[in-house]
């Protein structure tokens, strides 16, 4: 039957997404101009935020770049922000864009070493609780000195590596180098249950690791971009920052790790999945086969990757350059010394990060709408006019709520600027300023684990190649992050109230 042009256009719009989803996006695009005229730009601005969050929540139905991008373009056309405003937001976050372009690609060229190390760990450590603690604590420790996105890229690379190894074996195609692990058509029926259990197992580890990046990232000056911003305004160096934040960050870290143990013991919130024995055997055999196949050339590659990994950690820990530029150095070193000179081989490394980079620019457009329309101003004004003794906890709560919706750096910038202005005007003391700065820092970092749009690392995980493989949806991430959200928010809030 011949398809009409209008039918073809309808089918092409958002590709293979469900019809209801296409209709919802079209409804958004029709409602928005009407809302601007009838409800005004302020209310419509909040409508745009809700619509964008919806596209993130439906990431498994359609990659958010397309529907979210259409909404962002319309925001500019309707005058809720300007192209200059978007450019300003993008320019302000250029270091994050550089990081995604180059650092994530750099990690791609380290995947052999990462799989080698983590495979040994997974095969040798039998206790799921111990493995979960290792993932969470390692992510926290690394995120205290490296960028959370870099650490998340490592977790994703390891997860995809494990999944592809088992998926090949479960399909009876262990020797097929071109096997597509995104398709389950070839999975042998006997392996279906183990595959689903392995998915749950990897999902648990990735969520523990992702939350670990927040646990570590809050504690040091270089842990998160907003930490640098707050420290600069407050005039704190690395040691000052750590000591000021420690009364909150250290108890939160301890309680976060305790939460890992409780979740794995109780199997609450969909945690507690075990590594099936058949999967462990396959990973064990894979390790033995890889060890037997190792030539001097392969060993040389692993040595180079190990050396470059050390250079990477030292470069980021001492902040010798912007993270993205360090990532570019990693790409050059690994490809040069491991003989990867084919353009197409190099190109594969950028496939994972560039769609997310584009999505992040779309996100910055929504942040620009928030900025231009002063959508957060009423909340900011309420907190700033509260009694002095209740301000720290209210700053913590307000920053947490707003950071779960918007960009952490944007929220931190708004609040720390207002608090600094109050200090300069003599309205608050230096001691109170330091307390509020810690409340702002911990507020933007801890409760924001509630949603994927609250943490760039979470959003990266949600929109990465591994999310559909492990059936990790927006709703699933929110559900699995919920116990952490409660623990981090309550413990963080109590520490801000009583320990500062």
UniProtKB/Swiss-Prot annotation:
Signal peptide: none annotated. InterPro entries: Na+/H+_antiporter_NhaB. It is found in: Cell inner membrane. The chain crosses the membrane at residues 13-33, 34-54, 62-82, 97-117, 129-149, 242-262, 306-326, 350-370, 392-412, 449-469, 477-497. Pfam families: NhaB (PF06450). GO terms for cellular component: plasma membrane. Keywords: Antiport, Cell inner membrane, Cell membrane, Ion transport, Membrane, Sodium, Sodium transport, Transmembrane, Transmembrane helix, Transport. It is a multi-pass membrane protein. It catalyses: 2 Na(+)(in) + 3 H(+)(out) = 2 Na(+)(out) + 3 H(+)(in). Belongs to the NhaB Na(+)/H(+) (TC 2.A.34) antiporter family. Na(+)/H(+) antiporter that extrudes sodium in exchange for external protons. PANTHER family: NA(+)_H(+) ANTIPORTER NHAB, TRANSPORTER ARSB-RELATED. HAMAP family: NhaB. This is Na(+)/H(+) antiporter NhaB. It comes from Marinomonas sp. (strain MWYL1). The lineage of its organism: Bacteria, Pseudomonadati, Pseudomonadota, Gammaproteobacteria, Oceanospirillales. The gene is nhaB.
